[in-house]
Amino acid sequence: MSVSAAVDQYTVLTGDRSKIKDLLCSRLTECGWRDEVRLMCRNILLEKGTNNSFTVEQLITEVTPKARTLVPDAVKKELLMKIRTILTENEEEADEAEEEP
C-alpha cells in the first residue's frame, strides 16, 4: 500500500477526511479557484459547440490537469500541514494508549 493510500485510509477511518475536504473546499472558494475552473469549463463547452456530443467525462479529462496546476501553493502547503498535524496527533495518542497499563 502506498503512503498516500495509507494516509487516505487512515483519515477515512478516523473521520478526519471530511474535515480536510471541507478545509480544501473553503480555501479553493476563498482564492477564486472554483470560479476559475467553472469559467474554464464554460469556455471549453463553448469551444466544443452545443451539439451535446462533448460528454462530462471528456470535460473532466480536459479540465483536470489544468485545474490542478491552478491550485495555489499556499493551499497545498496548508493542507499538507493539516494532514501532518492530524497524523502526528493521532500517533501521539496511540503512543499514550500503549503506555497505559
From Swiss-Prot:
Q: What's the domain of life for this entry?
A: Eukaryota
Give the main location. nucleus
Q: Which GO terms describe its molecular function?
A: C2H2 zinc finger domain binding; chromatin insulator sequence binding; TFIID-class transcription factor complex binding; transcription coactivator activity
InterPro entries, A to Z: TF_ENY2, TF_EnY2_sf
Q: A Pfam family matched by this chain, by name? A: EnY2
Q: What are the protein's UniProt keywords?
A: Activator, Chromatin regulator, Cytoplasm, mRNA transport, Nucleus, Protein transport, Transcription, Transcription regulation, Translocation, Transport
Q: Which GO terms describe its biological process?
A: heterochromatin boundary formation; mRNA export from nucleus; poly(A)+ mRNA export from nucleus; positive regulation of transcription by RNA polymerase II; protein transport; transcription elongation by RNA polymerase II
Cellular compartment(s): Nucleus, Nucleoplasm; Cytoplasm
Q: Which GO terms describe its cellular component?
A: cytoplasm; DUBm complex; nuclear periphery; nuclear pore; nucleoplasm; SAGA complex; transcription export complex 2
Entry-linked HAMAP family: ENY2_Sus1
UniProt lists the family membership as follows: Belongs to the ENY2 family.
Subunit structure as annotated in this protein's UniProt entry = Component of the nuclear pore complex (NPC)-associated AMEX complex (anchoring and mRNA export complex), composed of at least e(y)2 and xmas-2. Component of the SAGA transcription coactivator-HAT complexes, at least composed of Ada2b, e(y)2, Pcaf/Gcn5, Taf10 and Nipped-A/Trrap. Within the SAGA complex, e(y)2, Sgf11, and not/nonstop form an additional subcomplex of SAGA called the DUB module (deubiquitination module). Component of the THO complex, composed of at least e(y)2, HPR1, THO2, THOC5, THOC6 and THOC7. Interacts with e(y)1. Interacts with su(Hw) (via zinc fingers).
Q: What is the recorded function of this protein according to its Swiss-Prot or TrEMBL entry?
A: Involved in mRNA export coupled transcription activation by association with both the AMEX and the SAGA complexes. The SAGA complex is a multiprotein complex that activates transcription by remodeling chromatin and mediating histone acetylation and deubiquitination. Within the SAGA complex, participates in a subcomplex that specifically deubiquitinates histone H2B. The SAGA complex is recruited to specific gene promoters by activators, where it is required for transcription. Required for nuclear receptor-mediated transactivation.
Question: Which protein is depicted?
Answer: Enhancer of yellow 2 transcription factor
Species source reads Drosophila yakuba (Fruit fly)
